[in-house]
């Protein structure tokens, strides 16, 4: 649970003794993780991802709860931006809709892939620069997507476009490893995309947080 989950549970369940409610964050042993190396070039070549662009990746469930219509708007607004490349990996109820959008618009700077085996997905992540998290803005109960952990394992800054009650983006921004926007705020998310794509040294610094 995150702090927002704890607050929600206490507020909406007064019958529960608050002293027994604790935050238990997800964690990973980073000493066992192989970080980015020269293989990234080969991985990008394998998937036809440009070597000289900043790669933003969304990996995970492609379903209605993620509010991914906004992600498509983000890609559409950056169709002429040769400095960025978007990678979407996953499966779910919205995959067909997203695939249809890709077929229609044929974005030159975006790639849609179905779910990969874990080892292949982890390799792909190592070749990316920025992790992206999306949640439908209509959520009224806090969510904390576990995909954040995969991004942090690979020392990537994150952009979280979520509802107003989830605190995953707030935590990323407060701790210096990401930015938080409301799902649907195209101006703000593009401002952060521009900032991260133009300052690779800042990306590295944020990824070390």
List each model region and its residues.
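Carbohydrate-associated surface elements
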Residues: 4, 24-27
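Conserved donor-nucleotide binding/catalytic region of nucleotide-linked donor-dependent transferases
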Residues: 35-39, 194-209
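Nucleotide-sugar-dependent
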Residues: 66, 117-126, 131-152, 157-170
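Charged active-site motifs of nucleotide-sugar-dependent glycosyltransferases
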Residues: 20, 49-56, 84-85, 130
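Conserved donor-binding/catalytic core segment of Leloir-type glycosyltransferases
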Residues: 50-66, 72-76
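A short helix/loop element that forms part of the nucleotide-sugar donor recognition site in Leloir-type
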Residues: 34-49
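Nucleotide-activated donor-binding/catalytic signature segment of Leloir-type glycosyltransferases, i.e.
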Residues: 83-90, 95-122
């Amino acid at each position: 649970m995150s702090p927002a989950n704890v607050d929600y549970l206490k507020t909406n369940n007064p019958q529960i003794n608050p002293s027994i409610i604790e935050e238990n964050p997800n964690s990973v042993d980073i000493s066992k993780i192989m970080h980015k190396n020269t293989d990234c070039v080969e991985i990008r070549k394998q998937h036809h991802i440009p070597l000289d662009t900043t790669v933003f990746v969304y990996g995970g469930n492609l379903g209605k709860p993620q509010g991914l219509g906004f992600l498509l708007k983000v890609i559409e607004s950056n169709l002429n931006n040769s400095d960025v490349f978007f990678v979407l990996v996953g499966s779910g109820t919205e995959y067909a809709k997203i695939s249809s959008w890709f077929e229609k618009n044929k974005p030159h700077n975006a790639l849609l892939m179905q779910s990969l085996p874990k080892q292949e997905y982890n390799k792909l992540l190592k070749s990316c620069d920025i992790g992206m998290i999306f949640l439908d803005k209509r959520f009224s109960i806090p969510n904390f997507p576990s995909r954040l952990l995969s991004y942090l394992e690979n020392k990537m800054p994150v952009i979280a476009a979520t509802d107003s009650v989830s605190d995953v983006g707030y935590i990323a921004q407060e701790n210096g490893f990401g930015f938080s926007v409301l799902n649907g705020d195209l101006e703000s998310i593009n401002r952060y995309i521009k900032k991260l794509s133009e300052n690779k040294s800042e990306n590295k610094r944020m990824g070390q947080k």
